[in-house]
Structure formats: C-alpha cells, structure tokens
Amino acid sequence: GALWWRNVADTPVKKFDLVMDVNARASYACAYHCLPHMLAAGFGHIINMSPPIHLDMVPGKVAYSISKFGMTLVAHGLAAEVKGRGVAVNALWPATVIESQASKNFGLGTPANWRKASILSDAVLAIVSHEPDALTGRALLDEEILQEVGVTDLEPYRCAPGGELIRIAGHNAVSGTFGTGAGGSVKANPLSIDNPAL
C-alpha cells in the first residue's frame, strides 16, 4: 500500500491520485478481476488490508484515509453484492503497530512497542478457516478475529517484552498520533512516497 500522512494543503493532486491508485483502485481492480473466477468456483475469500471506518483518524491524513476507507467500502459493498454465493469479502487491520520497514524507518516506537507481522498472517488464516458465507462483510482487527477463534494469549506476538504496545485502532487508540494508551504518545513522522518523480 501507499502511505501519505500529510495535510490537504501538503498533498498535490498528483500524490492524491497515486495514493488512490495504489490503495483503493488496486483493491477494486483486484476484486473485479478475481471475482468471476471465485463465483464460478462457488468459493473464495477476498481480504483487503484496510481499517474499520473511524473518522477520528482522518485529520492530517485525508488522502490516505480516503484511499484506505475506499478499500473497506469495497469489502462491505462487494460482500453484500455476492452474499450467499460462496465468496467472502472482509477488511483486516492491525490493532497495534506491526514490526515492518515502515515502523522501523519512520520511528514508530521501538520493538517493545510492536507486534510481529505473524499476528496478521494468523488473522488471515483465522478468516479463511471459516466458510465464506459464515464470515463476510466485516472490517476486522487482527486481535479481534483471533479472539473469536479462541486465541486468548497475544503475548507471543510481541516483538520484545517490557514496552507498551502502540495502539492504532480499536480500544485505547489515540486519534492523530500513535497512542501508547497510557497518556503518552509517539508522534508519527509523515510516512510518504516522497519520490519527486511521482
């Protein structure tokens, strides 16, 4: 996906178009091209990496939020369109900062504040373990779907002990920053596709 966390005044239309192309448009295009094959087979799972829609995350990230919420709307809308036809469409998002090149390169805390990427892969496995018609049309958090399938201990997903996880969605998430949940916060550096040629 494309990350661009800037104010509208700092987001040229060319950047907006790029973020929309990489996030919302790509999600739509992938679903459009895969859907006929899934419907013909009577089975499939489409999972978009996009958040539940909460407007408190929008200020300072309007272009990014529109692009990611667009992906979530694809999940909700398409799920309703194909309901009962053996194809599930859901959105999945981490509740906390995940160890990644983005979290490392842009100083989003330290390993003690992150979870491992394996929480997302396990969440995907939890989603696809359901029959498509049994779990569709939802915007899920990783820890939420894992708890639904009986995972009660999320500690093995921590990158390092001792720190407080930085919550970016769900319970105790702090709007506008990556909140630590304890009154403090880790300000996110603007993540961007800063190549001037873009």
Labelled PLM ranges:
Residues 6-8, 12-17:
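Substrate-binding pocket helix/loop in short-chain dehydrogenase/reductase
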Residues 45-84, 96-97:
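Catalytic loop of short-chain dehydrogenase/reductase
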Residues 31-32, 76:
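A short, exposed helix-loop element centered on a Lys and neighboring polar residues
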Residues 6, 87, 91-106:
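Short beta-loop-alpha junction of Rossmann-like oxidoreductase domains
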